[in-house]
Every structure is written in C-alpha cells, then in structure tokens.
C-alpha cells in the first residue's frame, strides 16, 4: 500500500467515528415540559399526557428540519441523559415519532416517574439536552 493510500485510509477512518458521534444542536433556550399530569398527581387508570415545548418545533421522526424534533416519554428511567445518545425504544422509552403533542398513557398501579426528552430525526438526544423536569405520578 502506498503512503498516499495509507493516509487516505487513515483520514477516512478518523472521519467515520466523528460522523457517527455527531450531535444535533439545540437552541440554548429550548424548554420542554409536561403540561399534564402535574407532579404528585394521583390518577385513576389510563390518562392523557400533554407535552409542551418552547423555542423549538415539532417534526416527525426522520424529518431533519433544524431546531425541531419529536417527543419521547421516559417512564421510570434513572440513567443519565447525554447529548448524542440514541434513545432506546422499549416500554420505558416511549417514542412519539409522528409529531404528537399528547398521548394516552397506560401504566400499572403504583408510583411512576415521567420525563419528556426531545429527540432529533434519528432519535438522538440534542446538544444541549432538551428534557423536562422529572415528575412523579401515582396510578391506582
């Protein structure tokens, strides 16, 4: 392999990880919040969770419009949220990729924490992280 070819291969190898770790920027004044339920709310059965967002827009998953993303509801999640992380899709990380601003949520009886996290077109956490305050609800 010639010196030029080796340099080209090394340069390409250096670029690929950087692209894979790219983080989508968010405005520093973006504000995500849960409109309802309120922190400490006691709820009977399923409920409508309403999402609020300021200084950014809502877009469907896959839509790369700048300063826009879609909601994810974290249920009973305690792991830290880091910019660039891919948001898992499971019962604790509920994706709203159609651009929903409210959703009917069904949880088993008991205490639960809820937190909204805004994801980019590829379900990655923005930089800086755009997340609501974590709230606690009790379902009976």
Which role fits each region the language model picked out?
Residues 1-13:
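N-terminal secretory signal peptides and thylakoid transit peptides that target proteins
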Residues 45, 69, 108-110:
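A glycine-anchored, Pro-Gly-centered beta-turn/N-cap motif
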Residues 52-62:
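Short amphipathic, basic-aromatic surface patches that mediate peripheral association
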Residues 120-127:
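Short acidic/polar inter-strand loop motif in beta-rich domains
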Residues 128-140:
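Short beta-strand elements
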